[in-house]
């Protein structure tokens, strides 16, 4: 799987789906990604956009790539 920002889906609902697919808690996911719980909450609420790099990392994790 190669990164392609053209596949970026900025919807918080998509992020929530990816997070749910990992089976990880938000704190565990934050530690894995090197971000705070607050960042994840802000992304999920739509307050702040999440970066494509986060989407790609989660997609790789879900697909076990």
Task: Please describe what each predicted stretch is.
Residues 20, 34, 45-47:
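Residue-level detection of the helix-turn-helix DNA-binding "recognition helix"
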Residues 4-6, 23-26, 56-57:
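Recognition helices and adjacent regulatory flanks at domain boundaries
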Residues 1-21:
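A short, Lys/Arg-rich alpha-helix, primarily the initiator
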